[in-house]
Amino acid sequence: MGARHEIKREYLAIVRGSVTPPSGTINAPLARTGSSMIERKVDFEHGERAVTHYKVVEEKNGHSLVSLILETGRTHQIRVHMQYLGFPLVGDYLYNPDMEYIHRQALHSWKLSFIHPITKNPMEFTAELPEDMKNILI
């Protein structure tokens, strides 16, 4: 299919509060937390490069819907980077165990785009925001 960077993925996440600044780039390296095989943290000394671009799409009901594009693809990158900014994902059992609004991470892969390897035509696929996430913004 070609190099991985040719595939563009865009995610939507819901966080509590008004994200400030409303757009930007998070350049904060990630590493495992202690002996955990799962949990990650920002670690400027030992972490691997991790870059996330974000932009607030909408604010409603005390929450922000945020568009996120990964420049790198580290485990839990979006979850840890948003927590690092002070805006963890709603319903994230590991980094923000607040299940008041949703019983899973409020994170959705909504757009995938790439150049078709044979026809060279641009391809784009989208998936609507799930109802449980929409309900948070009502």
Where are these regions (language model features)?
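RNA pseudouridine synthases
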Residues: 1-138
